[in-house]
Amino acid sequence: MTHKEMSEIFAVMLLAYPNAEVFKGGIAKLGPTINLWVTCLPEIDFWTGQQAVVKLVRECKFPPTIAEFKEKAEKVQAEVRARIDQAWNYLKLDMGLGKTPEEAVARLPEGTDIRRAIEAMGGPSRLIATGERTFGDGTVKTYEYYNYDGFKSAYETIIRQTSALNSGPRKAVGPGMKQIGGKT
């Protein structure tokens, strides 16, 4: 994560925890702290950091430590991997039972993230890829394999386009709900 991106994460925490001692003086005085966080969290990308900070703000009364932030970010990454693997296993099971990729995809409900990922890959036919293997005697054999890497990349892109895991954009106030201040 860059310093600018970490500053955005800290801006969210500043809003969530305005009375915390660490934020006295605002973002301008947090330079060394932000440098430390960036140095300690090189493996966390901005999107994962955003998801982690949203979850932490919902769950914690106090600003998180670097270790708590990293732990939550790792949980976000694990959730993404689990979601991708679950979708892939569903597709692979159907294809393993003799269904073509087109038949496996046809069973999926319209508008799902899995379908959008497959469309982003270039269609159901891209779920199976072709490779070549050269043997020691110079013979070349063609083989087919499940294109997990292509699916994983496309599905992760789709997940990252949504505002939070397992949800789309949320309305702040639904019909009949009261806002803060009592207005409907």
Sequence positions of predicted segments:
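Charged interaction scaffolds used for protein-protein
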Residues: 1-184
